[in-house]
Amino acid sequence: MSPAFDVSPAFDVNKAGEPEAVCPERLGLPNLGDGVGLRSVHFRHLMHTPPRDWGVDWFEIISENFIDNRGYAAHVLETVAAHRPVVMHGVSLSIGSSAPLDRDYLRKLRDLAARVQPAWVSDHLCWTGINGVNTHDLLPMPLTPESLIHVADRVRAVQDFLGRALVLENPSTYLQFQASSIPEWEFLGMLAEATSCGLLLDVNNVHVSATNHGFDAPTYIDSLPADHIVQVHLAGFTDHGTHLIDTHDHPVAAAVWPLYLRAQRRTGGVATLLEWDARIPPFADLLHELTKARLARAGVMPAVARVPRGTADSVSTPLQFQLGFAHEPV
């Protein structure tokens, strides 16, 4: 029998306006409830709204937007972290690269974690550059036994350096290596078992990659080790005709909600994060989208959202749309 879900938040709110957990932990990490990304376009709203009225259980930051940032964005983050749990989500770890780990970046990441005290630190199963060149994209890697050993060694090194478990997200991909011999879901599962890292299951990325490469999305979700999944990402994508691209600029598509329900039922319920990084709407619209997530957990599929269409010549989404928002004028 599938676990029962209701449409209430995963957290209660105490008299001070801070959420109190009512859901169990996994890998020693709590179910944070329903959250959104902390973006500069919403700084003014958050700073002028009492925390008890924010309407979300937690926030996720793009780590690179706050590394070396001691300005107004840091002040907002400090205020938010005093009232809600925060998760650090990075895009520059490049865990799959053959280049040495960037120790300077890791030191800055560790320093930021010391300031923020995040619930966890996450990044992506990908590589972003080599030999000092940053592609500003989350690139797929060959999924082979050799690369599994390579990435596992790097994950252990990062975890030792940071002094905490690392959480890795499945990327959206638009090409594959002919040398790959391990399905991505098996690769992630073996990596999690070998390193005790957590998994961030992006169900939008699963749908995007499944459509692009022709694999079965439910099989992907069902094959991951549920006890390692600590978080789920929701986002919108763009249909480019021959392929889909993960663009984070529209509401969650209808095809993604059943995958979200499947993931939540399989895990017994884990933290949900709505990503929206371009064409960012008012904060109230994000709360409305989170309400859809609560309904979906109850088995009530939200109304169909329009899927935007793009041109066939786009093959990926650069990272610039995620970076820099913390530094925009407010």
Description of each model-found segment:
Residues 102-199:
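Active-site acidic/histidine proton-transfer and metal-coordination neighborhood
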Residues 59, 121, 202, 232, ...:
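Conserved, mostly hydrophobic/aromatic
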Residues 43-44, 63-73, 94-104, 174-179, ...:
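Acidic-and-aromatic substrate-binding clefts and catalytic sites of carbohydrate-active enzymes
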Residues 43-50, 177-193, 209-223, 284-287:
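Distinct, well-ordered alpha-helical segments
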Residues 283-303:
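C-terminal helical cap(s) of enzyme catalytic domains, especially alpha/beta-barrels
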Residues 3-4, 14-111:
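N-terminal pre-domain/capping segments
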Residues 47-54, 71-88, 104-119, 158-161, ...:
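Acidic (Asp/Glu)-rich catalytic clusters
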Residues 70, 100, 138-148, 209-267:
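Gly/Pro-rich active-site loop or hairpin
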